[in-house]
């Protein structure tokens, strides 16, 4: 049985979120929560929130226990970029891209 949780339009670039996602890929759910608790990155807070949601989905919908859950896949795709303008000298301007990402976690029961 697989359980999925998504976070779309997360306000962090996919490159930064992938650094944290690579740390917990393939881990048990409880071990992944420990790793995320001790990480001081913003992306760790985002992924921890999604992982909690996926664990709750598995417990409520499938009746699984947290000790039996493992992260089957976790992937981060880039979302749309929000364009902003930064004023510069002599009336010029630069474009700033506020990048977003879509995060997906799939949990499966260990057998």
From Swiss-Prot:
Subunit structure: Part of the 50S ribosomal subunit.
GO molecular function, one term: rRNA binding
Originating organism: Wigglesworthia glossinidia brevipalpis
Gene Ontology biological-process annotations: translation
Role summary: This protein binds specifically to 23S rRNA; its binding is stimulated by other ribosomal proteins, e.g. L4, L17, and L20. It is important during the early stages of 50S assembly. It makes multiple contacts with different domains of the 23S rRNA in the assembled 50S subunit and ribosome. The globular domain of the protein is located near the polypeptide exit tunnel on the outside of the subunit, while an extended beta-hairpin is found that lines the wall of the exit tunnel in the center of the 70S ribosome.
Keyword line: Ribonucleoprotein, Ribosomal protein, RNA-binding, rRNA-binding
Listed Pfam families: Ribosomal_L22
Gene Ontology cellular-component annotations: cytosolic large ribosomal subunit
Protein family per UniProt: Belongs to the universal ribosomal protein uL22 family.
Domain of life of the native organism: Bacteria
PROSITE patterns, A to Z: RIBOSOMAL_L22 (PS00464)
InterPro entries in alphabetical order: Ribosomal_uL22, Ribosomal_uL22_bac/chlpt-type, Ribosomal_uL22_bac/org-type, Ribosomal_uL22_CS, Ribosomal_uL22_sf
Name of the molecule in the record: Large ribosomal subunit protein uL22
